[in-house]
Structures are given as C-alpha cells and as structure tokens.
UniProtKB/Swiss-Prot annotation:
Keywords: Ribonucleoprotein, Ribosomal protein. GO terms for molecular function: RNA binding; structural constituent of ribosome. This is Small ribosomal subunit protein uS9. Residues 22-31 have a biased composition (Basic and acidic residues). Gene3D superfamilies: 3.30.230.10. InterPro entries: Ribosomal_Su5_D2-typ_SF, Ribosomal_uS9, Ribosomal_uS9_bac/plastid, Ribosomal_uS9_CS, Ribsml_uS5_D2-typ_fold_subgr. GO terms for cellular component: cytosolic small ribosomal subunit. GO terms for biological process: translation.
Amino acid sequence: MAEEIKSFEDLKDVAAPAALQQKREPKRDAQGRSYATGRRKDAVARVWIKAGSGRITVNGRELENYFPRPVLRMVINQPFVVTNTTNQFDVVCTVTGGGLSGQAGALRHGISRALTYFDPDMRPALKAEGFMTRDPRTVERKKYGRAKARRSFQFSKR
C-alpha cells in the first residue's frame, strides 16, 4: 500500500502516520501540577509548575533572594516571556549542584520542559528558542602532565 513518490510536490500530499498526528495530552498530577527535570553543567533542577500568580520559589526561598543577579533572573524568566505566560504560573523548584549560572540554566531547561507538559502547544515556540535542548557543554577534565585541562606547565629550554 506504499504510495510512489516521484517529486517533492508529491511528498506534500502524503499523510503522516496516525501516531504522529495525535494531539499530545497534558501531563498533570492530582493538584494540577506538571513536573520536569532540567540540567546544565553539574546542576540538576526539579521543577513543578501550576497555574497561579507568577511566584517562583527556589529551594524554599524567593527567586530574588536566591539569584541576586538580574541576568540570572532574566534567564529563568525567558520561557515565560517567549510563551507570553508571564505571571500566569507558580513555580516551585529544588536545585542541586553547580554554581549559580549552571543552576539558572538548569531551571530554564526544567521550566521549559514543564511548560510543554502543562500545555503541549507551547513546545514549538520553546524549541525554536532552543530552551528544550540540553546544553551539552561541561567542564573539560584535567589531564596528567598538564597544569589544567589544556594549560601546560611552564617550559624552559635551558
């Protein structure tokens, strides 16, 4: 039953399989929360979001107290700005490992994933901005015979 495709114009007419056409269902628990995990460098963020007033709690503290630098707060709020849902979700998260920059990136990744579980229609906008992709860059390991990962010990000819 395979259709023969002779040109790119014919490719548009071919219907996608039924499994790909199905609408994704939102994943929410009994309290109406969506859960996701985000990672960046050595940091791991566990994120729960639910409809609310825009309150963000990190490790039991307010966002402004945990991340004093405005740049890091901006990074965390980017998924809400892209999806036009600022002040519509309450976020509760726990972050472990890494430094503040890695933790902010992990939070952004986790919030983006949780938003797509809450409302699958947000996925294309978040994916276009690159928020759904786990950043693979990590610290390069130190090598023996060298001072650091790439820095060599000082060399003297004589």
